[in-house]
Every structure is written in structure tokens, then in C-alpha cells.
UniProtKB/Swiss-Prot annotation:
GO annotation terms (biological process): division septum assembly
Species this chain originates from: Pseudomonas syringae pv. syringae (strain B728a)
Name of the molecule in the record: Probable GTP-binding protein EngB
Domain EngB-type G: 30-204
Record's keyword annotation contains Cell division: yes
Cofactor(s) this protein requires: Mg(2+)
Length: 211
């Protein structure tokens, strides 16, 4: 069945806008933005590329290469933002602190930010970085949706069990405000669910047909 969610067409026409090292280099703070965050090597760039059907986000065998806020335009009012990857051991500490400082500035000041997509490697979920992002989202009343990436690396049963376990842990620690799903970029698993979240946050009517 062909997905008719209106966000699909917008994602397919996504174009690179600019890279920002600091908040004052970001596009005008208006419209709708959804940011993608994740610990290094969590599959963030691959997820973005799969959702947009393009090679917009840079992928690398060396985690942590994304050092800037990268903005991708969907239309005049809507953008996706690729946030810096964190946690890679070979990144110098001063650079890590620089990334952290500007990430906090972006998250804390951006009025157009409507939601945060957090990538977790399903084999290594709930890292310290993930917990920090969850804490921030709840404290800031920011909608968050989690993609348990690389779900194809596990059997379906093991992936489902991990989903339920992480879901229970999040509900216990942070309540029901955070949604979560399985995702695999190579297998294109979970695209419909992710598109529906994006459409909701960007105030696009969900026209996906009912089951």
C-alpha cells in the first residue's frame, strides 16, 4: 500500500540549506523545525537519508564527523536539523565541550523547534547521552520520539523484546510523553510511523489510509 502521508513528498524534496557552528548562524527562527540527535554511530545520518530518500546527511565510518548543525529545507516553513553526533572517543575533549555548549544553546533558544527525534542503537540503548536528552526533553516540555535504529541487526523477537524493555524503562523514569519505535535504514523498517510523527509535529494533516 502506497503511503499518502503529506510529509513524504516534503521529505523527498528536502534540500541542504546551511551548516551552523553557532546559534546565530542558524536560519531565521520561524516556522517548524524537527531536530535529529544521537550518540555517535547510532545511525542518525543513515536514518535521515532514508527518510528523505537522498544522501543529504553525511555518513562516515568514523563516528562523530558531524560537527555542525546542518539544516535541510522541506518547504519555506519546515526544516530538518542534523545535530552533532556525540560520544566518540577520538574526538578531543575541547571539541566535545564546544559541541555541547552550542547544542545546549540551540535546544534552549530555538522557538521553531517542535520536536526531537533521538536515535538509539538498539544494541546499546539508554546511554548517558540518551538519558541527558530525555531529561532535557521532559524538563523543557519538548516532544520526543525515539528511533531504535539498526533493528535489522537483531531477530524480530529480540528487537521487539528490546523495544518493550526500553519502553518500560522510559515510562518508569520519564512517563508517557516519549514515544518509541523500531527502525532500520537498510530495511526501510518503521518509515510510516516516523513520517506520521513528523507530519504531526509540523502540523500537516495525516492522510495515511486507515487500516
Amino acid at each position: 500500500m502506497q503511503l499518502k502521508n503529506p510529509i513524504l513528498g516534503l521529505c523527498q524534496q528536502a534540500t541542504f540549506m546551511l551548516s551552523a557552528a553557532k546559534v546565530d548562524q542558524c536560519p531565521d527562527d520561524e516556522g517548524f523545525e524537527v531536530a535529529f540527535a544521537g550518540r555517535s554511530n547510532a545511525g542518525k545520518s543513515s536514518a535521515l537519508n532514508t527518510l528523505t530518500h537522498a544522501s543529504l546527511a553525511r555518513t562516515s565510518k568514523t563516528p562523530g564527523r558531524t560537527q555542525l548543525l546542518n539544516f535541510f529545507g522541506l518547504d519555506e516553513d519546515r526544516r530538518l536539523v542534523d545535530l552533532p553526533g556525540y560520544g566518540y572517543a577520538k574526538v578531543p575533549i575541547p571539541l566535545k565541550l564546544h559541541w555541547q555548549r552550542h547544542l545546549e544553546a540551540y535546544l534552549g533558544s530555538r522557538e521553531s523547534l517542535k520536536g526531537l527525534i533521538l536515535m538509539m542503537d538498539i544494541r546499546h540503548p539508554m546511554t548517558d547521552f540518551d538519558v541527558l536528552m530525555l531529561d532535557w526533553a521532559i524538563a523543557s516540555n519538548m516532544p520526543m520520539h525515539i528511533l531504535l535504529t539498526k533493528a535489522d541487526k537483531l531477530t524480530y523477537g529480540a528487537a521487539k523484546n528490546t523495544l518493550l524493555k526500553v519502553q518500560a524503562e522510559i515510562r518508569k523514569g520519564w512517563g508517557d510523553a516519549v514515544s518509541i519505535q523500531l527502525f532500520s535504514a537498510p530495511k526501510r523498517m518503521g518509515l510510516e510511523e516516523a513520517y506520521t510523527v513528523l507530519a504531526d509535529w509540523m502540523e500537516l494533516e495525516d492522510k495515511a489510509p486507515a487500516e
